[in-house]
């Protein structure tokens, strides 16, 4: 039996992963902390009121940029997921009991932080009859109720692609419905054993058919090829995905899937160009781009590309079209210059 540092018995896949040391990062995997006035105000509010965001608790490298623009992400449904993905740092196991007061608290946090755009994500809740559909929908409703000028992005699990559960979530009318595909078919089962590639595409297709702006994410560096990435992008576009984010996999701990390759900024630029050529209305691609990165900007961009007017109460999001995108690959190339192929090495 192999035991982790916290005394928990490792899963077989975790024990196998832990045989590979943590990888050393290439020079372009870095951020610069710029603490502007909006960030400092957000920080003071969060600290003073004991609020909780994914941004802080997951140590997101983009927190300074997003908070400066009054954007933040929240994790709902508890801290334990009923499924395990080999890249994800959220622990898996038996989830905690459903907290029906959580939607109100999240909505009040959004108000206290003065957010212009909020992303709501969470754990998978296969233990519940509705797989958490009510919770995901109610958080969106409460945020809209208490914060009519705040856009909401709902990043959800697949709810087993049950139409009646998806309907509950869709009817809450988030500005963006997001469901992340994450990887390519060949390695999907190994990386996300409790999910199904085609089922995830069907969930996105259902949201698109309902009339929602849709979004998904791809993580590179877990064993896929460039050609497979392009095919996955094509599958997402055919399913009706409006917004696409593409990012580099960064290994949370030694128990997670080893990094197979460092994807150069030039490849991220090429994927972004290919995505626009396929007809994606909005794309953000770069090593430290995360699925919620610059989400308000991407929503506004997608709305404009689809010929839709941004509602009057969210018209301030038009300003985000000119905001910063420090982690976009084109900006990294401007900052660091051309990159060299960097083999995976270990600390």
Swiss-Prot record:
The keyword Aminoacyl-tRNA synthetase does not apply. SUPFAM superfamilies: Radical SAM enzymes (SSF102114). Pathway: Protein modification; protein lipoylation via endogenous pathway; protein N(6)-(lipoyl)lysine from octanoyl-[acyl-carrier-protein]: step 2/2. Gene3D superfamilies: Aldolase class I (3.20.20.70). CDD domains: Radical_SAM (cd01335). [4Fe-4S] cluster 1 binds at residues 55, 60, 66, 292. It is found in: Cytoplasm. Binds 2 [4Fe-4S] clusters per subunit. One cluster is coordinated with 3 cysteines and an exchangeable S-adenosyl-L-methionine. GO terms for molecular function: 4 iron, 4 sulfur cluster binding; lipoate synthase activity; metal ion binding. InterPro entries: Aldolase_TIM (IPR013785), Elp3/MiaA/NifB-like_rSAM (IPR006638), LIAS_N (IPR031691), Lipoyl_synth (IPR003698), rSAM (IPR007197). GO terms for cellular component: cytoplasm. Its cofactor is [4Fe-4S] cluster. Belongs to the radical SAM superfamily. Lipoyl synthase family. PANTHER family: LIPOYL SYNTHASE, LIPOYL SYNTHASE, MITOCHONDRIAL. This is Lipoyl synthase. It comes from Corynebacterium urealyticum (strain ATCC 43042 / DSM 7109).
């Amino acid at each position: 039996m192999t035991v982790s540092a916290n005394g928990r018995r490792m899963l077989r896949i975790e024990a196998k992963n832990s045989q590979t040391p943590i990888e050393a990062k290439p020079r372009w995997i870095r951020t610069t902390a710029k603490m502007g006035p909006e960030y400092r105000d957000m920080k003071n509010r969060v600290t003073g009121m004991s609020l909780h965001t994914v941004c802080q608790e997951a140590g997101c490298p983009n927190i300074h940029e997003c908070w400066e623009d009054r954007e933040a992400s929240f994790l709902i449904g508890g801290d334990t997921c009923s499924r395990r993905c080999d890249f994800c740092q959220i622990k898996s196991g038996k989830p905690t009991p459903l907290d029906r007061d959580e939607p109100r608290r999240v909505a009040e946090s959004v108000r206290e932080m003065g957010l212009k755009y909020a992303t709501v994500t969470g754990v998978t809740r296969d233990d519940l009859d509705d797989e958490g559909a009510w919770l995901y929908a109610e958080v969106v409703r409460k945020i809209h109720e208490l914060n009519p000028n705040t856009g909401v992005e709902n990043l959800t699990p697949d709810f087993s692609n049950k139409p009646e559960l998806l309907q509950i979530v869709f009817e809450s009318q988030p500005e963006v419905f997001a469901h992340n595909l994450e990887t390519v078919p060949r390695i999907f089962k190994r990386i996300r054993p409790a999910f199904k590639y085609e089922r995830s595409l069907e969930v996105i297709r259902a949201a698109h058919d309902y009339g929602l702006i849709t979004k998904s994410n791809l993580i590179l560096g877990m064993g896929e090829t460039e050609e497979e990435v392009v095919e996955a992008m094509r599958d997402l576009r055919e399913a009706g995905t409006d917004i696409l984010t593409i990012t580099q996999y960064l290994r949370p701990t030694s128990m997670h899937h080893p990094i197979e390759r460092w994807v150069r900024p030039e490849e991220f630029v090429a994927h972004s160009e290919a995505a626009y050529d396929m007809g994606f209305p909005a794309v953000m691609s770069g090593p430290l781009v995360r699925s919620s990165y610059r989400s308000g900007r991407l929503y506004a961009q997608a709305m404009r590309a689809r010929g839709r007017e941004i509602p009057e109460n969210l018209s301030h999001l038009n300003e985000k079209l000119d905001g910063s995108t420090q982690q976009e690959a084109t900006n990294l190339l401007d900052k660091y210059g051309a990159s060299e192929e960097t083999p995976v090495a270990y600390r």
